[in-house]
């Protein structure tokens, strides 16, 4: 009986009590999907003799087995296993050397394969295997199952499909068990997916209202490119596309101040570096022309700022640093600078000019 239980996923104790097993490697389907031997005429004759002399009945039980012993008897599959469908195989198991044992087992396999519900039973088994599998694996399983079923049915084309209520009930019960098993396997995955959706919803509620986290991540890079362009501090243009336009208005209204301050900081960092080459060249030219007195007036500073594209602060800082590093006033220049701070001599100091004994003198 243990060998028969191995083929049908059922184990038997020494006292005749059965318990359910579900190892898919040794399940009835794993035995069914293996190609049957080529001795089909012998199987058909033995199957016909088996049906004629051993009518199937769900209400009969093998000797020594009570329906009330053990909690496993409430399982419909176990109740079917206790019937005379497997009783003949159990009797044959007493003589392992007999050739009728293997023939009866193969005959039962052939009946299951040729049964009208075999397709749904095989599909239910594959559904259990597909739980959590990648799409490409599921597609391969389906293709292999279809090809295998076609070859098996072709090999058993001569076997008739007689009506057997007990076998029908067995197929339906096993199919129902596989469906329930698939539901148990699928439930944890469904709970995990529901948890992920709930977390995503919470993250979306914490972020911008009405905008999904995926949209924020997808559009974040383009907005950063616009901010890092280094041009004018104007806000990016808004495309008129319904809901997206409202979301962009909301974003600009909420973060415009932050973006403006960020752009100003970026522009300051750029200005702290070296001045453009052309601007430095113009400042050096003015420096060489006015080396004796490198103090540009306010109007000259404005003109230099316009021609170089710099601001007045940059112009002042450049001349201060240039004078500290590369200019040393002569004695006459020091005298002029000292007299410029005394009121009696203030009349002699003008914009880039001063008057000495020989008359009006201009530096540069």
From Swiss-Prot:
InterPro entries: ELK_dom (IPR005539), HD (IPR001356), Homeobox_CS (IPR017970), Homeodomain-like_sf (IPR009057), KN_HD (IPR008422), KNOX1 (IPR005540), KNOX2 (IPR005541), TALE_homeobox (IPR050224). The keyword Nucleus applies. Residues 13-49 are annotated as: Disordered. Residues 267-330 bind DNA. Its main location: nucleus. GO terms for cellular component: nucleus. Residues 246-266 form the ELK domain. It is found in: Nucleus. The unit of inflorescence is the spikelet, which bears a fertile tract, the lemma, and the floret consisting of palea, two lodicules, three stamens and the pistil. The lemma is completed by the awn, an appendage homologous to the laminae of normal leaves. Expressed in the inflorescences and lemmas and at lower levels, in palea and vascular bundles. The keyword Ribosomal protein does not apply. GO terms for molecular function: DNA binding; DNA-binding transcription factor activity, RNA polymerase II-specific. Residues 19-29 have a biased composition (Polar residues). PROSITE patterns: ELK (PS51213), HOMEOBOX_1 (PS00027), HOMEOBOX_2 (PS50071). Keywords: DNA-binding, Homeobox, Nucleus. Belongs to the TALE/KNOX homeobox family. Binds DNA as a monomer. May play a role in meristem formation and/or maintenance. Overexpression causes the hooded phenotype characterized by the appearance of an extra flower of inverse polarity on the lemma. Binds to the DNA sequence 5'-TGAC-3'. This is Homeobox protein KNOX3. It comes from Hordeum vulgare. The lineage of its organism: Eukaryota, Viridiplantae, Streptophyta, Embryophyta, Tracheophyta.
């Amino acid at each position: 009986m243990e060998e028969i239980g191995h083929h049908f996923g059922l184990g038997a104790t020494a006292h005749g009590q059965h318990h359910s097993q579900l190892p898919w490697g040794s399940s009835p389907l794993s035995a069914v999907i293996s190609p049957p031997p080529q001795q089909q005429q012998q199987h058909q004759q033995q199957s016909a003799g088996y049906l004629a002399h051993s009518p199937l009945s769900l209400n009969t039980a093998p000797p020594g087995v009570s329906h009330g012993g053990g909690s496993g008897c409430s399982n419909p599959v176990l109740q079917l296993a206790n019937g005379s469908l497997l009783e003949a195989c159990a009797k044959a198991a007493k003589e392992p050397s007999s050739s009728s044992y293997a023939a009866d087992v193969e005959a039962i396999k052939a009946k299951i394969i040729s049964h009208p519900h075999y397709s749904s039973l095989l599909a239910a088994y594959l559904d259990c295997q597909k739980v959590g599998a990648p799409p490409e694996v599921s597609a391969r399983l389906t293709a292999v199952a279809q090809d295998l079923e076609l070859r098996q049915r072709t090999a058993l084309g001569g076997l008739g499909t007689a009506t057997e209520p007990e076998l029908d009930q067995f197929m339906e019960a096993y199919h129902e068990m596989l469906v329930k098993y698939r539901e148990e396997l699928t439930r944890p995955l469904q709970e995990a997916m529901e948890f992920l959706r709930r977390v995503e919803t919470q993250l979306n509620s914490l972020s911008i209202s009405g905008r999904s986290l995926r949209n924020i991540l997808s559009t974040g890079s383009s907005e950063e490119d616009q901010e890092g362009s280094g041009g004018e501090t104007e806000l990016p243009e808004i495309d008129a596309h319904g809901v997206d336009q409202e979301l962009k208005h909301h974003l600009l209204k909420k973060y415009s101040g932050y973006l403006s301050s960020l752009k100003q900081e970026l522009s300051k960092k750029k200005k702290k570096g070296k001045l453009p080459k052309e601007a430095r060249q113009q400042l050096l030219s003015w420096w060489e022309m006015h080396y004796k007195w490198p103090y540009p007036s306010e109007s000259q500073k404005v003109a230099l700022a316009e021609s170089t594209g710099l601001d007045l602060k940059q112009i002042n800082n450049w001349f201060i640093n240039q004078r500290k590093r590369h200019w040393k006033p002569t004695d006459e220049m020091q005298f002029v600078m000292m007299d410029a701070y005394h009121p009696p001599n203030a009349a002699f100091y003008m914009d880039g000019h001063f008057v000495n004994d020989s008359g009006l003198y201009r530096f540069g």
